[in-house]
Amino acid sequence: RFAPGIPVLRYHGTARSLDGLRPDTIVLTTYGVARREAAALAAHPWGLIAADEAQAIKNPISRTAKALRTIPADARFALTGTPVENRLVDLWALLDWTTPGLLGPLDRFRREIAVPVERDRDPDAAESLARLVRPFLLRRRKSDPDIAPDLPPKTETDRVVPLTTEQVTLYKATVDEVM
């Protein structure tokens, strides 16, 4: 819709192939395929790698995060609605993938930033981190007037759904076990 002339290749399924890949092609794949096919993907020059729903790489020691780090690219960016879910190491992992070295090695980041902020509530460490990452984070909200004006308002509907007989039995067994 926005760039109909740009070729797009779906690299997914059993018949996937990168044969005849042109430099201007956008390649779409899944994290699972990227993890399994990292060597094949790393054999090609990439101008840009974009990780959508990048919470999939927030654990820096996961197989997926490690695999994506082996695929060289001139630039990388990560899209996520939750850059930090549980700990600051989530943020370190995303930024170390997009901008290697920005926050230093993981052990130093933990020692100098994560522990002081998370455990000690150190405002100086928090401000230092905020200053470092501010240029790399873009926070947008659906309420911002320029963000997707054609999106309808959010609608929430509660529906009562009865449990099946099996679900009732499992629920009662769990309650009895816990109580």
Language-model-detected regions and their locations in the chain:
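Conserved helix-turn-beta segment of the N-terminal RecA-like "Helicase ATP-binding" lobe
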Residues: R1-H12, L102
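ATP/adenylate-binding site constellation spanning eukaryotic-like Ser/Thr protein kinases
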Residues: G5, A73, V175
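Conserved helix/coil segment N-terminal to the catalytic DExD/H
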Residues: T14-L48, N59-R63
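Inter-lobe coupling linker of SF2 helicases/translocases
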Residues: L28-A34, A39-A43, L102-M179
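SF2 helicase catalytic motif II
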Residues: A42-L79
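Conserved AAA+/SF3 P-loop NTPase catalytic/coupling segment centered on the Walker-B
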Residues: L88
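A short helix-turn-beta junction within AAA+ P-loop NTPase domains corresponding to the substrate/partner-engaging
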Residues: W92-G104
